[in-house]
Amino acid sequence: MPPPDSNPGSFRDHLKHDNKNNNSSTTSKGKQRYTPLHDSIPEEIASPRSASASSSFDLDPDLENQSRNDYKLRPLARSSSTNGGHNYSTAYIPVIRDEGDDVETYLDSITEAEQELLSLSKQYDFADDSDDFDSDDDAALRRKVQKQEQRRRRERLKAKVWTPVKYARIWRRTLVVVIVALALLVWGFLRFTAAQRQGPKVWPMLPSDSWFPSPKGGTLKHWEESYRKAQSLVRNMTLIEKVNITTGTGWQMGMCVGNTGPAELVKFPSLCLQDGPQGLRYADHVTAFPAGITTGSTWNRTLMRERGIAMGREARLKGVNVLLGPSIGPIGMMPAGGRNWEGFGSDPVLQGVAAAETIRGIQSNGVMATAKHFLMNEQEHFRQPFEWGISTALSSNVGDRALHEVFAWPFAESIRADVASVMCSYQMVNNSHACENSKLLNGILKDELGFQGFVQSDWLAQRSGINSALGGLDMSMPGDGLHWTDGKSLWGRELTRAVLNTSIPMERLNDMVTRIVAAWYQFEQDEWERPPPEGNGGPNFSSWTGGDVGWLHAGSNDGLYAVVNQYIDAQGTGPEAHSIIARKVAAEGTVLLKNVDHTLPLSRNASGPSGVMRVGIYGDDAGPAQGPNACPDRGCNQGTLATGWGSGTVDFPYLVSPLEALETAWKTEVEMTAFLRNAVMPADVADKDLCLVFANADSGEGFISAGGIHGDRNDLFLQKGGDTLIRTVASHCGEGQGKTVVVIHAVGPVVMESWIDLPGVHAVLLANLPGQESGNALMDVLFGDVDASGRLPYTIGKSLEEYGTEAQVLYEPNAPVPQVDLLDALFIDYRHFDQYNITPRFEFGFGLSYTTFKLKDLHVRSLQSKSRSPAARPAAAVSPPEYNTTLPDPALALFPPGFQPVYKYIYPYLPSLDGTAPANYSYYPKDYNQTQGPSPAGGGAGGNPALFQEMASVSVQVQNTGDRKGQEVVQVYVSFPSDEKVKIDFPERVLRNFTKVELEPGERREVQMTLSRKDLSYWSVREQNWVMPDGDFQIWVGRSSRDLPLQAKY
């Protein structure tokens, strides 16, 4: 989704390369990166070696490093008879300079390939620097000599006999060929045996499978009443009203970022859809909550839900019908992915639990939540063609097993939590656009997972009209088609026309609108106050202006204005203030990674060797800089980092910086000096007793480029010189006698190898993205007001390469349609490290505490007898609504007489009856006429209800063995048995449950968790169902993915 002032204009037909040389933008191995067409914030330094529309060849890098005096390359000019000018054919070939007079000796010394190159070079004019001053006679004489030399060389080569040198050369080449051939044979054999061993190791579906027709909603019992009400309403709607509900009115054509048209005859209102995952975007008097990645770091289910409740409450008070969050795609397959911070962590169970709790919290207020982005939106590069100047968005190619076990798992949990809406993503999946991918939307989401709500597109993610409707899309957002704010929708009047001419069945349109209306009833929004003119309901803020009066249609020039901002304070007050939950989440989401000699927590009654404690604060991440809202959608890295950038952000009502909080943190007098810059001298730290150094790493959505980062990070290092800053401070703090505490604010994992083991680094806190209460929450942990109880939601490796080849962002197009192949996506994050026996710096789930805990007495008890397959899919509890599908008179779809349309506003009306006559449409998607049977894995919300039967209980004793209150996160991992019937690879172990428990010193408590059938199953591609393998499962219980002291069999 673009910034509010986005104006795409015409697309540039060239690419530019960014070679800015600084710590934040330097690319891996010095490679240039493909950069987007939008301008960078701040402005990037453009490379002089931009690739233009004209054809040219770049110099070889090694050749470029040579002196220009050694080589001179001259193209031949060929006259053009058409325009009198010249067309140039350019080739760069180094000029061969004579090092002596023995030309024949030289020719003998070069390879046959070089001889052939010389013979072909006669079409070019090679010259050294002095050639520009040669006379015509000299040039003619030189050409004559060259021809004679070439003739003699050819004769000499014909007469040349074999020599021992020739034989040696042939044997060497033959040996190389044999070695390469043997290596290929060995490689092929190993690949074959690995494939045999893994059995259903799934290769990408290229192209994506098809699944038609789109399943109807209204088949689950707990949605029955809502669908009954929706049926009564939809039955009385006109075709125009149905289309109006399914199509947005256009970008900036309403108060919210997304607005649907109303159905006025049946009194169904326009719906307001608003970002997002961190709070209400573009709204006043709302809370800037900690980001999703910080929430995931709490591993606290209660806080996850409380945060969701507060977000839903604010959306309700602001008149928002649909909140566009939580974000659970990307899941973090690529650690440098730009939007990973919006989600909760790089594990499907952690992501799924956090998503479900957030959704339940949001929807407890009657606000519809949105699970996004479905599916495989793992990187920002090439997600949209118009952002990058390519013809088509990239394709994320993934196998069926990884799709189910990793990427779709959190969405299944969201549907079990009754999420009202699912947003499809920008890119393609297995070479079919996600918002028209019938296998994903119809087959997996609506049939297998039993989704009863509506599917909406990401903003401009819809890339077709008919195919997207048939493929399972229910709502087009924001209504615009292929370009922003041009008033040309792929639906709107085009959907009206397609239904009338039978290209799209009326039955499909009825299901689309029924799903939307049923969700509206499911969360009792029919009881909300009616919007004007009947009441004072609807959105009470404008996304496009901060003034009380503004345009009603900011994307048009119609001149209509009204009071658009009522400044309703939605943040809560007193003990109900949402800042309280924001501070709790930020504090519990802070992860203690290192703590030498109990450096932390700090004492508020501090003193130094000389009496007064001398404290130094280092790094611009400690201070407020220009303020939290200095850049649109937080699209710059300045001051303390409290959020990433993009549509998932929020306008901060305030931001407490670490420096502001530190100024009032100590009870005794301290001498505190702040150096709010990332370049300090040793003298700046030499006289300090305590050095607090702050550094960060930022990223965000692909429509913004900031600091040389085009959405996705270029690497995993700290930005703006943060690593150098830490090394300098840690090496010189107190002339080696002081203590250095490092605080990191980051969107994801950062590589710490250059400083983590320095003796001067005594403690490290990863504060993630803490939101508006950043400084206050940090003080709570830094001074021990609360325990350090955060745990890593991802693995911190020692290098980006350790995460594997498939975890790397594709920075350069590798095909006209960029292809990202995720063949080993099953082994995401810590699973990859386990699979290849790589020791990370800090493993998934890791985090230190200010106290100590002991786990003991693990018991695993069987609750159900094992069976390979779940019970059969149950029959639908209720039948979906049925309607009369008779087409109306096309004349009723024309603009009403005297109607004055708003410029660029998207209407369902037709300007004429052209194209409305029923016709035989012949461009349907592949296999459209083949009806698919129901999936055996379906039958309920989130899948077959049998998958969620509890198979085993896990109990363990947890004791606080320290001297202060603290919280422990108990994590349960499962290792699958080796099924001899179907040989298949499993991850070493996978997270399957967790709980967080708070204990007083010496307190002991038993905690219990359960494992479901799905927890103990894998997705069988052959059977298209979840299968429990035969044999004993190993159950591990501990504190992280690699600290698992207890184990038992099941």
Swiss-Prot record:
Biochemical pathway: Glycan metabolism; cellulose degradation
Q: Which domain of life is it from?
A: Eukaryota
Residues bearing glycans: 236, 244, 300, 430, 501, 540, 605, 884, 920, 929, 993
Q: Which SUPFAM superfamilies match?
A: (Trans)glycosidases, Beta-D-glucan exohydrolase, C-terminal domain
User: Which molecular function GO terms apply here?
Assistant: beta-glucosidase activity
Task: Provide the membrane-side ranges marked Cytoplasmic in the record.
Answer: 1-174
Query: What does UniProt list as catalytic?
Result: 458
Extracellular topological intervals: 196-1050
- Chief localization class? membrane
**What Pfam families does the record point to?**
Fn3-like, Glyco_hydro_3, Glyco_hydro_3_C
Composition bias, Polar residues: 78-87
This protein's record includes keyword Glycoprotein: yes
Which locations, inside or outside the cell, does it occupy? Cell membrane
What is the similarity comment for this entry? Belongs to the glycosyl hydrolase 3 family.
What this protein is called in its record is Probable beta-glucosidase E
What is the primary gene name for this protein? bglE
